[in-house]
């Protein structure tokens, strides 16, 4: 299969992932460079012709969030001015997704602002994974392909025989029940829910309140879309252990892991935390309890399907995991 009119570029956030995606597709990464001037301004240079090409930019808006977002916008502008046929952004992790509504008076809806900026810059399509709020897709007037990480996480546990009635998939809050139910369908397990109350005085902290469902004598698998400071997931794991769980595993699509996250995980009842590589983790963050699995095959398949105008629906098939 020839991909002579397909180009994949990497910016600063996920270079290793981009290399693996390019290998999956069977192409070379596009030649570009990013530099930052002493005053903080960013300059992006495209170092090959992309006239008439269908271009994909791979970049997560993880930390440093604002720099990574601005790199995308500048790159899109450069590609449009260089006569790219189409510009598609592959954003494995969509930053600002937690600011998807007005929770209090006079708050912004920043995830909508990000959508507006991407569209105004000239993005033709967005490919992303496990948005914190799925309805963010509705903030866009361009096509949004929203992939799921659950099949990859399910495959990890299934390969280790962690299926059936001895296991229970646990959502750390009410908002993640749909995600937990999906993983439970893959693994043929029951589900449980942690009922927690988040502190209104301190950001990124939460208090575990109650466990809904049977976990005593079971191996529990927690699943969330993202783990930030890891307070929620660690408190949930400790509560499950106190309730009689034999072992507690945890999983998420987006390992933000900011601040004291790795220390919290190390001290918690979590035996293993399984994460995807939507966000690059430096060596000091990859502690023994954390195992990272790659989304390169999933993204490569999705990019090829988009380029060839084939449906992405097979990537969501419960009976046919990635």
Curated annotation (Swiss-Prot):
Residues involved in Mg(2+) 1 binding: 132
The pathway entry for this protein reads as: Metabolic intermediate biosynthesis; 5-phospho-alpha-D-ribose 1-diphosphate biosynthesis; 5-phospho-alpha-D-ribose 1-diphosphate from D-ribose 5-phosphate (route I): step 1/1
Task: Identify the SUPFAM superfamilies for this entry.
Answer: PRTase-like
**Required co-factor?**
Mg(2+)
Its main localization is cytoplasm
**Subcellular localization:** Cytoplasm
| Cited function | Involved in the biosynthesis of the central metabolite phospho-alpha-D-ribosyl-1-pyrophosphate (PRPP) via the transfer of pyrophosphoryl group from ATP to 1-hydroxyl of ribose-5-phosphate (Rib-5-P).
Q: Return the protein name.
A: Ribose-phosphate pyrophosphokinase 1
- The species is Streptococcus pneumoniae serotype 4 (strain ATCC BAA-334 / TIGR4)
């Amino acid at each position: 299969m020839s991909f002579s009119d397909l180009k994949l570029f990497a910016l600063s956030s996920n270079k290793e992932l981009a290399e693996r995606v390019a290998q999956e597709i069977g192409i070379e990464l596009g030649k570009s460079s990013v530099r930052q001037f002493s005053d903080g301004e960013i300059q992006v240079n495209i170092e090959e012709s992309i006239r008439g090409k269908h271009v994909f930019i791979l970049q997560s808006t993880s930390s440093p969030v604002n720099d990574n977002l601005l790199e995308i916008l500048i790159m899109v502008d450069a590609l449009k001015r260089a006569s790219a046929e189409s510009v598609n952004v592959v954003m494995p992790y969509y930053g600002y997704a937690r600011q998807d509504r007005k929770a209090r008076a006079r708050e912004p809806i920043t995830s909508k602002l990000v959508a507006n900026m991407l569209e105004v810059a000239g993005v033709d399509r967005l490919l992303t994974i496990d948005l914190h709020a799925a309805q963010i897709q509705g903030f866009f007037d361009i096509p949004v392909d929203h992939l799921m990480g659950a099949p990859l996480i399910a495959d990890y546990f299934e390969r280790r025989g962690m299926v059936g009635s001895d296991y229970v998939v646990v959502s750390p809050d009410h908002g993640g029940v749909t995600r937990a139910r999906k993983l439970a369908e893959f693994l043929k397990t029951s589900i449980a829910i942690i009922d927690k109350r988040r502190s209104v005085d301190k950001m990124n902290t939460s208090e575990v309140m109650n466990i809904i469902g049977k976990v005593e004598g079971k191996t529990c698998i927690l699943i969330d879309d993202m783990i930030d400071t890891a307070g929620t997931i660690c408190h949930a794991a400790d509560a499950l252990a106190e309730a009689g769980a034999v072992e507690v595993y945890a999983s998420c699509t987006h390992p933000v892991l900011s601040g004291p996250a790795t220390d919290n995980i190390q001290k918690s009842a979590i035996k293993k935390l399984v994460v995807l590589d939507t966000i690059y983790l430096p060596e000091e963050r990859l502690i023994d309890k954390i195992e990272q699995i790659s989304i390169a095959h999933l993204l490569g398949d999705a990019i090829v399907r988009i380029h060839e105008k084939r449906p992405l629906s097979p990537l969501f098939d419960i009976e046919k995991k990635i």
